[in-house]
């Protein structure tokens, strides 16, 4: 059984009457991931910490809690996606993961697909908009403001 180090000064994100309640110090589980995840996940955490500090000063901060999936989980407990990881993702409601390797071979389901299915995550929502000062090959790129929705649980992904 895996035991994660829950930050003692963090709080759990909750819902009240269908509205998300984000505390000042939310606990956010993260999975480092495999391959490039080892390099990009720590940078992602630094960027988010900086952005929150810039927006809220010292009044708000993420309390990070490492959880395991992929090769790291295999090394620690002998399975690629431990139930404890899924339980933590459910309990804390918001989590972030780095890229996870999918071994090649028959009969193996992608860890990413397993996470989506077991947590009933059915949509990938991606806002797309222009940021002033960035270069773009599009004409009138400053008018770009849209959202892409991809359904993730159908046998074939459907994007709108």
Residue ranges and their predicted role:
Residues 150-156:
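Conserved small/polar residues in nucleotide/adenosyl-binding loops
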